[in-house]
Amino acid sequence: RGIWKIIPCQLMIFTREEYQHRLKKVQKMMQEKGIELLISHDTNNINYLTGYDAWSFYYAQCAIVHVNAEEPLCFVRAQDAGGAYIKSYLKNENILVYDEEYIHNWPSHPYDQLVDIIKERNWEKLSIGLEMDAHYFTAYCYEKIKLGLPNAKLKDSERLVNWARLVKSDTEISYMKSAAQISERGMKTAMDVINPGIRQCDAVGEIQKTLFRGTEEFGGEYSSIATLLPTGKGTSASHLTATQDKFVEGEATII
């Protein structure tokens, strides 16, 4: 683990002050809901609270917010520790790394270590808010917390962080405007390349290329969802992805 601590800089797209403002806003909402400790599993909320945004959400990870803490904690697997050190604004000691031995090694689970961390900090009797409907917060995650912390008062946080994210800062709005410019270019490419006789996958390739290239000022990256391109009778099913079939004249296409 120590090798990651020599990384010389953090690559943050928001200032430390903005992250601190977000934390204070979330902590105020926690107080209002009677939550002393928040375990946030939603990958977007983890990013909002810490800056961490690696593509690692498919396995257990979370941000942990104590109602009186100066920083949240970021709980990630060892393989992804470097990403947390690079992308988050947190001090090294607030990045908590669990061993790879917990991966696919049932009945062991990363939240076994999370429970131990909570006990070590004497938080096991607190009122703990959980994101009960968050993607990838599995039933097993919940069971580990429930069984491991029998004296805690567990409650649904009711999308607390999601509501905090609702009001955007000037910097966030600026980034959204940049993203809109990239989306506009992607839509123009789609209008240009979708024609009868063209394969759907070829059109998607051009659209993705445009989205990744971005603008002269802002580069793009992968989109938040696969490029959906239902066409013909597929337009009755909104979330179909492209195939190698060709576009047919007179058929509708959803971009």
Question: Which residues does each PLM region occupy?
Answer:
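Generic secondary-structure signature for well-ordered alpha-helical cores
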Residues: 119, 150, 178-188, 192-199, ...
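Short aromatic/hydrophobic contact patches that present stacked aromatics
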Residues: 129, 191, 228
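Short catalytic-site patches enriched in acidic/histidine residues
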Residues: 46-56, 158-163, 167, 198-255
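A composition/biophysics-driven feature that prefers long, compositionally simple stretches
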Residues: 4-185
